[in-house]
Amino acid sequence: MNKLPLAKRAQILSLLCEGSSMRSIERIVGCSINTVDKLLRDAGEVALAYHDEQVRGVKAIRVQCDEIWSFVAVKQKNRVTSKRATDPTAGDCWTWTAIEAQSKLLISYLIGSRDAEYALMLMDDLRGRLANRVQLTTDGHKAYLQAVEEAFGADIDYSMLIKLYGEPPSSPEAPRRYSPSDCVGTRTEKITGNPDPKHVSTSYAERANLTMRMRCAGSPG
């Protein structure tokens, strides 16, 4: 069985990190797309295990949470009429992230639905990786309320940063927009403990999610 040289494996991973598609990597490196796919999966499993083992006992100060939308094969609204109508893995999916505001360390993350079950999974995982009480900021997604309470109880300083949106656009293109209406302001809501109002923010988490989206844009084959 042929084994890909280390230099080529490093080149493939480097190109993947730069956002190159698997098809383009196949052409550049001169290997099959199955090889690229297997290396991507293997590297992902190693990274997952490394993060799970090493990101423990984190002495964080402020943590910000956010979710980023994507879809598998077909958007949820089009799934019923698509060829993937009976595929339980198809449709909308969300990447949940919890980032430490000072170091920008991604403490916890998961992929799934944007519902209470996954909110609790994120908060339980976050709680298990922290070494101390932190200030937490999330957006206004209601699923966080019960999740934070169940995971942390009163041992947290928690605020929501709620965005206020204007009227939805009335142009013919409006139904095809991915994003909501323009944000016209924000308000904060203290939920638990004594969060510092000066540090109620999700800016770092949102910036990290934008970077994730841009770097992953070319990754599908």
Label every PLM stretch briefly.
Residues 1-221:
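Residue-level recognition of single "structural anchor" positions
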